[in-house]
């Protein structure tokens, strides 16, 4: 460089940006270093020196921005322009064969080409590029919206801040997976051990934990990587290639990292061969996977197949069998689930299963413990079912010690000391503590606030967790004693949100008796039974005092439901909570049915999206008119009400010859 004049310096700065981006792509994406590290570092320091002298030149695309910035207090929410759907899973070859058959039959073709690729065990991410520049990155979240992790994503050197190539779309949302290479994970854990810091259990946890750091400077120190494999929003649509494989090739041209372990497959035989080939070398791959994914290769055929529920019809995840290991049972405890289920859990000598240290494994229920004959002191085979939930598979009885102890199910709940009961025809024992039991409290509150129950908008799982953990709420009745200050002081709860939640709680006092009964969370009492009970008893106190014999006279209430209701009502603390709720100003109305002769006694099934109402609203209208709304289509179904994007229920109705009507025709029947 002959001069330090601003013009020449600006040219040099532009050259360094482009050159360093090229070198990073070669190093982190192509695994083909073009310069020694010392030379790269020299160029990078020169870039930093120029930016220090001319900070006005720095943009979000500068490689210096990968080091991380100011720590955040919380992540903002990002709504996905195109939902990030999950995939249906297959564990058996027969499920894969059925998937291929469904695709061929739906497309009316003899053969379908599939794009086969790996299912990475990391964290799904969406990257939004506008005119080639990375502007937003978000986690999958619930599929509809996720967390804004843009600052953290920019620290991952495998992800380009600026796309390369000539054919760059105006808007491109790249879907992919953030993960850690095994060698990078092991090196990071070794360094953590040397410093006396906590080690991560596995690469997936390390990747997820690193990406969700509020301080991006911490993320910048973590060896995260990325592979692109999917597409979200796109403008213009004319940019879209014809096939998934061509899309991935286009990604490579744009400078995005794409896994090379992929193949276009033309038959079930080729699919199974690909699955077995990857499975054979799974342990030697440089990263963790838990299966392979098949996607119909043609985008036109994908569009024809569409979606069902929260998953595409054109794709399937083929999981590998769970991995197993042997260890010793040190003890057997019981855990209380959110619905009161008592689950025996084996405490194990620590053992590595599928790269995870396992110290506990589920034994499911008392019958399973007896069937497998699991005893304290036994050597057992432990498996991570679905590579997630550890379970005891079998006992190695040849190694059983003479002092091995049998498991005895406790008679009292270890959390609240309520009686543990087990109905004769059920495998699961349950705590009878109901709302009084701390283990069940959070789920009871979430159910109480559900939109089909008391419909308390804004009272979600995260708020409930804080209310219970801070001992602000023990029962649903405590919700109606909450003050503005207590709510406003909760994490992620400002004054406006606190005010809105208090209003929602107050509004919930005016509800129906049926919703109130359903909200109590009595086992076996769903919405329909709650409505039948409300119509029969007309008041809460009448239901509370009902005997089993009286309950059996209610429509569709059998011995199991009657026993469940009386057991719930006989618990003194449950009655106390109900009385507190009633004393808080609850106004419980009994819905009057407006009988329609055209639908009375008829069975309806709802599917798809309706033009003027939700399916829940349609269900309420039909039930008030005396109809029954079922969840699946059968020969006993009288009508299927279908909206747009109707799924498999519509196909089933056509197969069985069940009449299909739209929303307008349903409303005409109700007149």
Swiss-Prot record:
One GO-annotated biological process of the protein: DNA replication
Span of domain BRCT: 594-671
Positions that bind NAD(+): 37-41, 86-87, 117, 140, 177, 295, 319
SMART domains per the UniProt record, alphabetical: BRCT, HhH1, LIGANc
Positions contributing to Zn(2+) binding: 413, 416, 431, 437
GO cellular component, one term: cytosol
Family the UniProt entry places it in: Belongs to the NAD-dependent DNA ligase family. LigA subfamily.
Protein name: DNA ligase
Species assigned in the record: Polynucleobacter asymbioticus (strain DSM 18221 / CIP 109841 / QLW-P1DMWA-1)
């Amino acid at each position: 460089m002959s001069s330090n004049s601003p013009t020449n310096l600006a040219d040099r700065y532009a050259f360094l940006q482009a050159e360093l981006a090229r070198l990073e792509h070669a190093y982190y994406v192509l695994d083909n270093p073009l310069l020694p590290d010392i030379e790269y570092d020299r160029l990078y320091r020169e870039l930093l020196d120029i930016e220090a002298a001319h900070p006005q030149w720095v943009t979000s695309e500068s490689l210096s921005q990968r080091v991380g910035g100011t720590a955040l207090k919380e992540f903002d929410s990002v709504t996905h322009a195109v939902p990030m759907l999950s995939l249906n899973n297959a564990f058996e070859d027969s499920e894969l064969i059925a998937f291929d058959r469904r695709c061929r039959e739906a497309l009316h073709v003899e053969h379908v080409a599939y794009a086969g690729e790996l299912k990475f065990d990391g964290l799904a991410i969406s990257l939004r590029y506008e005119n080639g520049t990375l502007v937003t990155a978000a986690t999958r979240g619930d599929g509809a919206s996720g967390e804004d992790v843009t600052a953290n994503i920019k620290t991952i050197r495998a992800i380009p801040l600026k796309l390369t190539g000539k054919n760059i779309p105006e808007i491109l949302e790249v879907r992919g997976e953030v993960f850690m290479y095994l060698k990078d994970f092991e090196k990071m854990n070794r360094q953590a051990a040397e410093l006396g810091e906590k080690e991560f259990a596995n690469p997936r946890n390390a990747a997820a934990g690193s990406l969700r750091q509020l301080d991006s400077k911490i993320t910048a120190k973590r060896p995260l990587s990325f592979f692109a494999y999917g597409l979200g929003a796109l403008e213009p649509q004319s940019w879209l290639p014809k096939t998934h494989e061509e899309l991935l090739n286009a990604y490579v041209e744009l400078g995005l990292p794409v896994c090379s372990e992929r193949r276009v497959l033309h038959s079930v035989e080729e699919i199974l061969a690909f699955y077995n080939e990857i499975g054979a070398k799974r342990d030697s791959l440089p990263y963790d996977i838990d299966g392979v994914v098949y996607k119909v290769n043609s985008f036109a055929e994908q569009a024809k197949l569409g979606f069902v529920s929260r998953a595409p019809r054109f794709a399937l995840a083929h999981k590998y069998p769970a991995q197993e290991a042997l260890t010793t049972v040190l003890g057997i405890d019981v855990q209380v689930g959110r619905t009161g289920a008592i689950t025996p859990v084996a405490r194990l000598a620590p053992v590595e299963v599928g790269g995870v240290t396992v110290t506990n494994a589920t034994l499911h229920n008392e019958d399973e413990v007896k069937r497998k004959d699991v005893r304290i002191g036994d050597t057992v085979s432990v498996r991570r079912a679905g590579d997630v939930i550890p379970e005891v598979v079998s006992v190695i009885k040849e190694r059983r010690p003479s002092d091995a102890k049998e498991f005895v199910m406790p008679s009292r709940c270890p959390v609240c000391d309520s009686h543990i009961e087990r109905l004769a025809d059920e495998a699961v024992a349950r705590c009878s503590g109901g709302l009084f039991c701390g283990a069940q409290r959070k789920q009871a509150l979430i159910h109480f606030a559900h939109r089909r129950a008391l419909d308390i908008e804004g009272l979600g799982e995260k708020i409930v967790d804080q209310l219970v953990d801070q001992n602000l709420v023990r029962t649903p009745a405590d919700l109606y004693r909450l003050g503005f200050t207590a709510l406003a002081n909760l994490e992620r709860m400002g004054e406006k949100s606190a005010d809105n939640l208090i209003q929602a709680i107050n509004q919930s006092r005016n509800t129906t008796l049926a919703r109130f009964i359903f909200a109590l969370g009595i086992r076996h009492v769903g919405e329909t039974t709650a409505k039948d009970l409300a119509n029969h008893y007309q008041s809460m106190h009448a239901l509370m005092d009902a005997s089993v014999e009286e309950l059996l006279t209610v429509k569709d209430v059998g011995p199991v439901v009657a026993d469940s209701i009386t057991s719930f009502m006989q618990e003194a603390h449950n009655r106390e909570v109900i009385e507190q709720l009633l004393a808080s100003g609850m106004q419980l109305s009994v819905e009057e049915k407006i009988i329609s002769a055209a639908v009375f006694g008829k069975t309806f099934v709802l599917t798809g999206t309706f033009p003027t109402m939700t399916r829940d609203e349609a269900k309420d209208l039909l039930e008030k008119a005396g109809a029954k709304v079922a969840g699946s289509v059968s020969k006993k179904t009288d009508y299927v009400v279908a909206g747009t994007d109707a799924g498999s229920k519509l196909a089933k109705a056509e197969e069985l010859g069940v009449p299909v009507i739209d929303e307008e025709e349903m409303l005409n029947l109700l007149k």
